[in-house]
């Protein structure tokens, strides 16, 4: 009975650890979904994709790319952007909901969006002045951190 308990604990530990192991591997730009390549061509004109990788973790699949200007972008398996980090310039305003962009333009006229993360529930933004803003799915501001 003691051996069975130990075996059960070992099996349980192995299955608990499985989601933490991710398969990350570089891929060719042509292996990216067309939606990702089109997004980059539309909103990051003048840059090229310097590096691309796919990450498989349990049921999560995402694409990560680095552009020639140092920008880092992440996309889900459907090719929708989930995170954008810019080094020297603003996240393109055309991809930010107009209600959020207007709030930032009015409230922080000298700042721009350096980073944005988005999922079905939230938009999290980091501005060039160091403020971190969180908006809910209704585009209502719900948190500010400095």
Segment roles from a protein language model:
Residues 23-146:
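Interaction-mediating elements
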